[in-house]
Amino acid sequence: MGVESTYNWYWLVDGLMDAGYRLHLANPAAIQQYNGLKYTDDHSDARWLAHLLRFGVLPEGYIYPKAQRPIRDLLRKRAHLVEQQTANVLSVQNIILRNTGARLSANRIKSMSQAEVHALLPDADQALAVSSALTVLHCLAEQIKTVETRVRTRLHRTPLYELLQTVDGIGPILAQTILRETGDMRRFPTVGD
């Protein structure tokens, strides 16, 4: 049975696999749509996927093991929080640079007190914009730390995990992220797959 990989396929694939079905997760990015179709909808897409599966040419995605998805998704959430943190730091840097000409490092911004903000930006509206961003930054930092603490309790110290950390710049969290995103490398029979 083939299922198209969409943003919400987990529940369907898990339920069907739990019921004993053998699943193929169709990779829509790798599927060429049939040019002769005059219109497409879910029914015609399903028929097309069934034909590809029947002929043995359905491009497939990897069904990541159900038990490992929560920690991978938690690491993805961490990455998203870090992106938000970076966006907030850049926003504060830009406000300060535009209004004072001062270039402050990310670490300096993260450690600023409200008094320092008001001393640097005497305009109340500008100070409020920076203060708001700093409040969000502190919240994001706290949540990133919470997620990292949880991830550290779930680390699996495999030889590959240890090897990854020998690369400069790769610590425990990034090594775990790489391992969780790549999954089991044995699923690739040859280099380039």
Model-derived features with residue positions:
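Glycine-rich, often acidic, oxyanion-interacting loops/wings at catalytic, nucleic-acid
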Residues: 75-163
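Short alpha-helix plus adjacent loop in nuclease-associated cores
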Residues: 17, 24-76, 80, 115-119
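Short, well-ordered alpha-helical microsegments
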Residues: 9-13
